[in-house]
Amino acid sequence: MLKSAIVSIVRASTRFAAFTVLIGVFLAVAAGFYTYQHFGINTDINHLISSDLDWRKRDIAFEKAFDQERLILAVVEAPTPEFANAAAAKLTAELSKNNINFDSVKRLGGGPFFDRSGLLFLPKDEVAKATGQFQQAVPLIEIMAGDPSIRGLTAALETGLVGLKRGELTLDATAKPFNTVAATVEDVLGKQQAFFSWRGLVNPEPLTDGDKRAFIEVKPILDFKALEPGKAATDAIRQAAVDLKIEQDFGARVRLTGPVPIANEEFATVKDGAVVNGIGTVVVVLLILWMALHSSKIIFAVAANLVIGLSITTAVGLMLVDSLNLLSIAFAVLFVGLGVDFGIQFSVRYRSERHKTGDLEKALVQAAEYSAVPLSLAAMSTTAGFLSFLPTSYKGISELGEIAGAGMAIAFFTSITVLPALLKLLNPAGEKEPLGYAFLAPVDHFLEKHRIAIIVGTIGVALAGLPLLYFMHFDFNPINLRSPKVESIATFLDLRKDPNTGANAVNVMAPNEQAAREIEAKLAKLPQVSRTISLDTFVPPDQPEKLKLIQAGAKVLEPALNPEQIDPPPSDQDNIASLKSSAEALRRAAGEATGPGADASRRLATALTKLAGADQAMREKAQDVFVRPLLLDFELLRNMLKAQPVTLDNLPADIVSSWKTKDGQIRVEVLPSGDPNDNDTLRKFAAAVLQAEPLATGGPVSILKSGDTIVASFIQAGLWALLSISILLWITLRRISDVALTLVPLLVAGAVTLEICVLIDLPLNFANIVALPLLLGVGVAFKIYYVTAWRSGRTNLLQSALTRAIFFSALTTATAFGSLWLSSHPGTASMGKLLALSLLTTLGAVLLFQPALMGKPRHIDESGDTDL
């Protein structure tokens, strides 16, 4: 019944060939127009998991409550903390004026509130120490505030040397500051880009990268009609940084990360090189088709059939899922790789029949008769393999399976309608030579003669490698699927190195402030937790004592910071004289002494002497290098001395909105201890937090849950694929033994594929795990072709035209998968790599293992025709 139906379809298609082709072209054009109107890609990796899962619902609720998805984090990095803060303040002010691209712009951990209240967040003893240092520095601050120039700086230096004479400090204690100043002067003299931080000078610990960063949180207005909805916003930020001369004035750079830039660059990474790879793939596929078919007319027919099918599949896919995702977009490559298989199988069968009969229409009908069962069974099995993803919670692959499954049905239908019609219209020349591979006769005989040894050896190798699967691991971190070369990911990876940035934070929602405090207290006791943060964190403890210390310091320091008058700017000659005077004072201080302090004094004296002997422009540059950050620090110091009590009631609204929802829920942020870049550390951290607070969400918790979901989906899809394909095979073949002959080589290929993955250190991940259930659908097609030929009594299968069709079909599929391997996107590339590997093992199983496993047919075809 199936055979007669397909033969009837082929007869009708060739009888009305022009009409059939016209309908196919019309549908392809209409589908292309629909695709043009509705094409879209959702690049958000979070949407690859079903939103119906409990943990995903919590993630989504949290993201909506705090608008986390629509976020750009601008990271301002400068050579000094002063310039990082100044550049961020300038950029924040500029972006706040833009109501076209941004809904809101705010500083994180900076701005007026933190400038004024910064001292309150220090421990009480550190506040006392800082205010004490302020009072000791009054004479120096008074000089520099009243004369912010080279003259004032050198005067402050000489005042400090007086303290050295009095024994208030040792010469060696000056080694660090003197060397730091000397190095900066040397950079100026060497015409290098020079920067100086007064904060770094007085800080006992070296400045970290985190000290020299400032953050701006931007909520952009997204254009969802564009393929990159946030591109206008990110472009506006970058242009603002250029217009403000952030790099020239502050030596700063602005990098963007967060969901919006990551999504933008994710799409850019996917399309990067896609055109070149696509063209290369087409060229190679055409070359393979030529080697398989040796006829430009047949190649044109197969290629045209493929284009028509792909156009229709794309439109149908968009109808099914609205927009493609980063995994489902691979359907096009899968369609080319697998859809062309049907075309090659039918065309090679047609060529074989044309060689025997010489009549075009008769050859097409006979090709349909011979191909009907294996081709339709292969199409159904491949479709079943793809559709096995539908019941899973891994939405990204579920949608890929849905589209690719529809694509296989479309490819099969066009291969028995449009392709025969095209061949009828094009009327390729007859075949003069048989299509089999007679040179493979020795291999056929070897497989037959050593059948038992090959079966035992192959299964033995597969079984011996099973212990390797213990070392197979799943890389559950989706960040590893993204290119570390793009700015947004490179920035995120840099931030992740700093445990204080919260890049690996987990969040817990508390119903109220008291519950938040209880959750904080419980989680803070976990060894896997380094610290917790909530709204209460922004209300410093011990404020009365700290405010008294600050007020006492302000009484002494404010007059020095705000002199009644500022000295007129010095002349260049004044600066030269002051430099020489300070150099001489440094040499006197060093005297004949040895040690780091004396060496540093002489080094600084030499640098100041050289600066005095340089041109005026060099001295003006040096003055700018030291004075600009000094004035910024003085302004910050003035603000810090104005600290006022901080309560939950007077916290800035932008801080409150980041930690408290409108209905009163409080966010508790939990940061991990240990190496934040270690997957095992993050897994233990997430597990510990979940055990204490099962409703925790975000960060490593979401990553851990995603990994569990995907592994479960893979197992579920694999079982569904195996079950559905087995049922299809049994319905068609009606023999359990024949079903086993089809599936055993497939399972062996699957086991060997995983074993090789361990040996070449190719872990499974969110993207490439798709290859394994697909292996069932793809690989079973080749097995079906051999089993159906074997059941019909054919022998010497390697010498047949069937092997030619399978070999070149596999080559085209490998080429399509190889194009994925060459992708700039790490996730897509890993998927292509594993697909290509699985195809290689599958081809080896079908060409070498399966003939030995099948042995001689039950009923041998005595015709002796190997050109099948």
Curated annotation (Swiss-Prot):
**UniProt superkingdom:** Bacteria
Q: Which residues form the SSD domain?
A: 299-425
Tell me where it mainly resides.
membrane
Cite the entry's keywords alphabetically: Cell inner membrane, Cell membrane, Lipid transport, Membrane, Transmembrane, Transmembrane helix, Transport
Q: Which SUPFAM superfamilies match?
A: Multidrug efflux transporter AcrB transmembrane domain
State which residue ranges cross the membrane: 16-36, 273-293, 298-318, 326-346, 370-390, 403-423, 452-472, 710-730, 740-760, 762-782, 805-825, 834-854
Keyword Transmembrane assigned to the entry: answer is yes
| Gene Ontology annotations of biological process type | lipid transport
Q: In a knockout, what does one observe?
A: Deletion mutant no longer contains any hopanoids in the outer membrane, and contains elevated concentrations of hopanoids in the cytoplasmic and inner cytoplasmic membrane fractions. Total hopanoid abundance is unchanged. Deletion mutant grows like the wild-type strain and forms single cells when grown at 30 degrees Celsius, but grows slower and shows a filamentation phenotype at 38 degrees Celsius, suggesting that cell division is affected.
Question: What InterPro entries does the record tag this protein with?
Answer: Hopanoid_biosynth_HpnN, MMPL_dom, Mycobact_MmpL, SSD
Protein role: Essential for hopanoid transport from the cytoplasmic to the outer membrane. Required for the C(35) hopanoid, bacteriohopanetetrol, to remain localized to the mother cell type.
Q: Which family does it belong to?
A: Belongs to the resistance-nodulation-cell division (RND) (TC 2.A.6) family. MmpL subfamily.
**Name of the protein in its database record:** Hopanoid transporter HpnN
Biological source species: Rhodopseudomonas palustris (strain TIE-1)
